[in-house]
């Protein structure tokens, strides 16, 4: 069903390329997972390009759980413990402890404050003391191998921003409807059209990587 709805956004390969182009232009992307998985759409942005206005949009239309997707190397650089030692969540979502910038924020809740926290966490020279714990930004550790290892929004975010040429760090938040329910594919696509965002699925990204990477290794 989703593939029929998605045809307006191009072929699977076109959808990935349009998503990468949007990220390079500083725009957001809507990422859908499988209908048989969470069946949710997440707004994602390249962390280093995200604006206050985009963070405000994310907070206004999202679940309120603004996540910063990072690699294991970045988690270690920041000395962020995992939220739990025994992860029993259904999809193994890898939350670390929450964070707040140590400098330049007030309560940490505003769009500006959350973006300040994101920027503190992704700085090249970021160190553990640059962040307070807990806070209002939720880091997520991506699994090595990206969507080829785990078909989650976290891994899709890292793959997309990396393929777009940015450092491997991205912001995501689940899109919700006005009544507080989770947005499904039709609502995600309507939101994407309204805000001029491309739509891509995790399945698209898996196919894109599988098609490209053997060729790159052969070259």
Swiss-Prot record:
One annotated GO molecular function: 3,4-dihydroxy-2-butanone-4-phosphate synthase activity
Reaction(s) catalysed (UniProt annotation): D-ribulose 5-phosphate = (2S)-2-hydroxy-3-oxobutyl phosphate + formate + H(+)
Gene3D superfamilies hit by this protein: DHBP synthase
Positions bound to D-ribulose 5-phosphate: 37-38, 42, 150-154, 174
A Pfam family this chain is assigned to: DHBP_synthase
Keywords linked to the UniProt accession: Lyase, Magnesium, Manganese, Metal-binding, Riboflavin biosynthesis
Enzyme class: lyase
Enzyme nomenclature, EC number: 4.1.99.12
Disulphides: none
Keyword Thylakoid in record: no
A GO cellular component entry from the record: cytosol
Cofactor mode of binding and number, as noted: Binds 2 divalent metal cations per subunit. Magnesium or manganese.
Site (Essential for catalytic activity): 136, 174
Names of required cofactors: Mg(2+); Mn(2+)
Pathway: Cofactor biosynthesis; riboflavin biosynthesis; 2-hydroxy-3-oxobutyl phosphate from D-ribulose 5-phosphate: step 1/1
Residues involved in Mg(2+) 2 binding: 38, 153
Similarity field: Belongs to the DHBP synthase family.
Oligomer and partners: Homodimer.
PANTHER family assigned: 3,4-DIHYDROXY-2-BUTANONE 4-PHOSPHATE SYNTHASE, GTP CYCLOHYDROLASE II-RELATED
Protein's job: Catalyzes the conversion of D-ribulose 5-phosphate to formate and 3,4-dihydroxy-2-butanone 4-phosphate.
Name the record gives this protein: 3,4-dihydroxy-2-butanone 4-phosphate synthase
């Amino acid at each position: 069903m989703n593939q029929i709805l998605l045809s307006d956004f191009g072929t699977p390969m076109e959808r990935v390329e349009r998503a990468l182009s949007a990220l390079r232009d500083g725009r957001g992307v809507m990422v859908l997972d499988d209908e048989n998985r969470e069946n949710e759409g997440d707004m994602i942005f390249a962390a280093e390009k995200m604006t206050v206005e985009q963070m405000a949009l994310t907070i206004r239309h999202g679940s309120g759980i603004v996540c910063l997707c990072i690699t294991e190397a970045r988690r270690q650089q920041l000395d962020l413990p995992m939220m739990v030692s025994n992860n029993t969540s259904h999809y193994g979502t890898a939350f670390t402890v929450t964070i707040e910038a140590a400098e330049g924020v007030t309560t940490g809740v505003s769009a500006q404050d959350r973006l300040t926290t994101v920027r503190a966490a992704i700085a090249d020279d970021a160190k553990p003391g640059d962040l307070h714990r807990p806070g209002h930004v939720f880091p997520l550790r991506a699994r090595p191998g990206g969507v080829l290892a785990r078909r989650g929004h976290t891994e899709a975010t890292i793959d997309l921003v990396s393929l777009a040429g940015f450092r491997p760090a991205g912001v995501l938040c689940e899109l919700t409807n006005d009544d507080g329910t989770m947005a499904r594919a039709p609502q995600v696509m309507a939101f994407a059209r309204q805000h001029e965002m491309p739509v891509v699925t995790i399945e698209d990204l898996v196919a894109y990587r599988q098609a490209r990477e053997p060729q790159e290794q052969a070259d």
